[in-house]
Each structure stands twice: as structure tokens, then as C-alpha cells.
């Protein structure tokens, strides 16, 4: 005697709007949650015209006027560095974030391609909107194209917001410890 297996009910799928009425799973409205971080704003190479807005953002974040430092870093990025990797994020026609970084082919006797993240900032009015993630996403993409293997930075141990952000984008503590000695 034969045993009859149960038969599944027919599967039906809602007809799509594409050719052949298939469903277009790549349609922008269907997968907004998968957008790349760098698509949240216009991220491009930093220019000298961005200086005033970068200084404004940095002053709002640090509470200090670091215009001389920012100016030196921007000049270094524009003229002294063979590879420009510093970026600015624009939204609503204004600079709303920046990342200053530099490519380094080694230090302390090491010869490995490393980038150093000098400073990053996002306008307080645009925090928690993916601007920082967009900047670092584009920075990492650009550095990978240059065959840079690693990005390093230094963070104050009490800057919990920045530490949390850096952990969130994949940074982890290194095996090196920075030492400082005051000279009187």
C-alpha cells in the first residue's frame, strides 16, 4: 500500500511592478535600513574653504579655540601630505562634520601602512544622525583603496562618548601604551 504524503498548499507571492511583474527587492523604498552609512550626507575631500566651519564645529565640541591647530592640520593635509585623506561632511548646504587623518608608512622602526586619525567632529545639531559613521565609512573605504592596513588614534580615557563611538565603528584598544613625562 502506498502512503500519501501531505501536499503543501500552493505558495503565492504578490505580483511586483518590475518587468515580468517580479518584485524588485532593490527598490530604494524597500530597503532603507540597508543604506550605506556614507549615503546619509555628502562626504567629500576636505578643502581650505571648509576651515571656518570646521573651527566652528570643533569649538562647539571642545569649548576651546583650536583654530591654529586645525589650520595647521588642514594646511598639512592640503600641501604637505602626498595623499589627502581628510574629509568633510555636508548636509543642508553646510559642513556638519569632519575627520582629519593622515597616511603613514611607519613609525618607531615599523614599516607597515597605517593611517592616523588626528581629530573627528560632528556639529552638535547633527549628532546621532549617522554623520560620524558616514565620515569613517568613507575614510575606511578610501584608506583600503590605498592599501592601508590599520587606523590608529589616541583618546582620553574619560571621553566616554568618543570611546563608545570608536568601539561602535570597530576600533579596539591597541597593545601599545602611550607614556608621557612632564619637563619642568
What residue ranges belong to the model's regions?
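Conserved GNAT acetyl-CoA-binding A-motif
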Residues: 143-155
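Short coil/turn motifs at secondary-structure junctions
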Residues: 104-106, 125, 158, 184
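Conserved beta-strand-loop-alpha-helix junction that forms the acyl-donor binding cleft
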Residues: 127, 153-163, 180
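General detector of folded, globular domains
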Residues: 102, 107-108, 133, 140, ...
Amino acid at each position: 500500500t502506498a502512503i500519501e504524503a501531505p501536499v503543501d498548499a500552493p505558495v503565492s507571492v504578490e505580483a511586483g511592478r518590475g518587468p515580468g511583474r517580479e518584485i524588485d527587492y532593490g527598490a530604494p523604498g524597500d530597503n532603507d535600513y540597508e543604506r550605506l552609512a556614507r549615503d546619509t550626507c555628502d562626504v567629500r575631500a576636505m578643502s581650505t574653504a571648509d576651515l571656518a566651519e570646521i573651527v566652528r564645529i570643533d569649538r562647539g565640541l571642545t569649548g576651546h579655540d583650536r583654530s591654529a591647530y586645525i589650520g595647521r592640520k588642514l594646511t598639512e593635509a592640503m600641501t604637505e601630505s602626498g595623499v589627502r585623506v581628510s574629509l568633510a561632511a555636508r548636509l543642508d548646504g553646510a559642513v556638519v562634520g569632519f575627520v582629519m587623518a593622515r597616511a603613514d608608512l611607519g613609525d618607531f622602526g615599523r614599516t607597515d601602512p597605517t593611517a592616523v586619525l588626528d581629530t573627528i567632529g560632528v556639529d552638535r545639531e547633527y549628532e546621532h544622525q549617522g554623520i560620524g559613521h558616514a565620515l569613517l565609512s568613507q575614510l575606511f573605504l578610501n584608506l583600503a583603496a590605498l592599501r592601508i592596513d590599520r587606523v590608529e588614534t589616541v583618546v582620553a580615557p574619560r571621553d566616554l562618548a568618543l570611546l563608545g563611538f570608536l568601539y561602535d565603528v570597530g576600533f579596539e584598544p591597541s597593545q601599545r601604551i602611550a607614556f608621557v613625562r612632564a619637563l619642568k
